Swiss-Prot record:
Organism for this UniProt entry: Kineococcus radiotolerans (strain ATCC BAA-149 / DSM 14245 / SRS30216)
InterPro entries: Aldolase_TIM, ThiamineP_synth_sf, ThiamineP_synth_TenI, TMP_synthase
Pathway: Cofactor biosynthesis; thiamine diphosphate biosynthesis; thiamine phosphate from 4-amino-2-methyl-5-diphosphomethylpyrimidine and 4-methyl-5-(2-phosphoethyl)-thiazole: step 1/1
Sites where the protein binds Mg(2+): D74, D93
Known cofactor(s): Mg(2+)
Gene Ontology terms: biological process: thiamine biosynthetic process; thiamine diphosphate biosynthetic process
Protein name: Thiamine-phosphate synthase
Record keywords, A-Z: Magnesium, Metal-binding, Thiamine biosynthesis, Transferase
UniProt: 2-[(2R,5Z)-2-carboxy-4-methylthiazol-5(2H)-ylidene]ethyl phosphate binding residues: T137, A138, T139, G168, V188, S189
């Protein structure tokens, strides 16, 4: 078994094809990485598997040589075929332990929304957790009730692996996540829908690092 890829979750971008619009996902990713995005998850719910594979490969071309990890949402087969760095699973996706047996070298992320779900994670199987939603978010209307900063802290405290916050995170509420113990935070619309994704990413990263305590 080879070591799993390096992974910096500080500023974790989850792509949204619709929000990226005519610019396209790869162009937005390129700009966002220039602004300081440190990990990218390709989330594409529309289209067939071939289209999703083509998108993952296009983003992979953008990320090559940058050191930024490429994570694929849900689709273990596409992650393996493309040679991505990892896959991110939801609670209703394939069991994490089964995926780990199938893909021992992939980074494996899992979405959780309660302390009990976090505490049940096997750190030999799962590398990191996506915790949320922290706030209400329009990009995932079927998400659980918002945790808020206190709920986020409770989930992180129960987790045996690093946690990344997700859901409705914007510059005006980012500072409320300080002291929660998170290893990083995810954004979707804040970067994908921005007129200048590079500037949006840079502003988020500067705010997080510039006022970190």
């Amino acid at each position: 078994m080879s070591p799993r890829p390096a992974f910096d979750p500080t500023l974790y971008l989850v792509t949204d094809t619709g929000l990226c619009g005519p610019r396209g996902v790869p162009a937005v990713v390129r700009a966002a990485v220039a602004g300081g995005v440190s990990a990218v998850q390709v989330r594409a719910k529309d289209g067939g598997d071939r289209e999703r594979l083509a998108l993952v490969r296009a983003v992979q071309d953008v990320l090559r040589g940058t050191g930024v990890a490429l994570i694929v949402d849900d689709a273990v087969d596409i992650a393996l075929i493309a040679g991505a760095d990892g896959v991110h699973l939801g609670q209703s996706d394939l069991p994490a332990a089964e995926v780990r047996r199938l893909a021992p070298d992939l980074l494996l992320g899992l979405s959780v929304s309660t302390p009990a779900q976090a505490a049940a994670v096997d750190p030999a199987v799962v590398d990191y957790l996506g915790v949320g939603p922290v706030r209400a978010t329009a990009t995932k209307p079927d998400a659980a009730a918002p945790l808020g900063p206190e709920g986020l802290r409770a989930v992180v405290a129960a987790a045996p692996v690093p946690c990344v916050a997700i859901g409705g995170i914007h510059p005006d509420n980012l500072d409320a996540l300080r002291g929660s113990g998170i290893a990083g935070f995810c954004v979707v619309s804040e970067v994908c829908a921005a007129a200048d994704p590079e500037a949006a990413a840079r502003a988020l990263r500067t705010q997080w690092h510039g006022r970190a305590s």
